[in-house]
């Protein structure tokens, strides 16, 4: 598996637990040509960072790292997309794999999505990011079939409203 982790803000760093201890080639904030060359050697690729339905943002958040120009290279891959609206990107281009939708990973996103700020929100959000990451890591280590991830995650998520919001729109596509 190839992991491409675009660390643009501290909250994106919290998702490194997803690939910790896995046999994976990990690229942190790589150049596009390096990433595209590495992609040729792998059947599964995981992208982590911030983004929207049109792609994964670059580390400066002023453009895209992954956009429609990548689609041809991704069509025959299994993709794990961990960025806001990755599921929309996958659906738009017919990609297969596991994807998040709008995924609240920091306090400003919490407020932007209409949730009230609460005491210790920073710590709770960090804890839930870590919990999500550790769960995906276990699924990957134990070869849990990807088509079971969404249901399993939704059944096990905490009852905090924003967490339920995050998990309700997880997306799997074959």
Model region roles, listed by residue range:
Residues 78-174:
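Active-site-proximal C-terminal subdomain of hydrolase catalytic domains
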Residues 34-39, 68-72, 91:
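Short, T/G/N/S-enriched strand-turn elements that build extracellular solenoid repeat scaffolds
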Residues 52-74:
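A short, glycine/acidic-enriched catalytic loop
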Residues 19, 59-62, 94-96, 113:
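Short, glycine/charged-enriched secondary-structure capping and boundary segments
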Residues 9-14, 31-33, 50-57, 85-89, ...:
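Short acidic, S/G/P-rich loop/turn micro-motifs used as interaction or catalytic elements
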């Amino acid at each position: 598996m190839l992991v491409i982790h675009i660390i643009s803000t501290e909250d994106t760093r919290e998702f490194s637990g997803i690939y910790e201890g896995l046999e994976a080639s990990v690229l942190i904030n790589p150049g596009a040509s390096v990433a595209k060359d590495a992609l040729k050697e792998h059947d599964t690729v995981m992208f982590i960072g911030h983004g929207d339905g049109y792609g994964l943002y670059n580390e400066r958040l002023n453009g895209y790292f992954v956009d429609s120009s990548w689609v041809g290279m991704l069509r025959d891959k299994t993709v794990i997309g961990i960025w806001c609206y990755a599921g929309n990107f996958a659906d738009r281009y017919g990609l297969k794999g596991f994807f998040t939708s709008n995924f609240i990973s920091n306090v400003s996103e919490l407020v932007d999505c209409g949730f009230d700020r609460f005491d210790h929100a920073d710590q709770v959000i960090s804890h839930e990011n870590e919990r999500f990451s550790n769960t995906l890591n276990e699924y990957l280590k134990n070869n849990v079939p990807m088509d079971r991830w969404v249901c399993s995650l939704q059944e096990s998520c905490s009852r905090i409203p924003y967490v339920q919001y995050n998990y309700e729109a997880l997306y799997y596509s074959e």
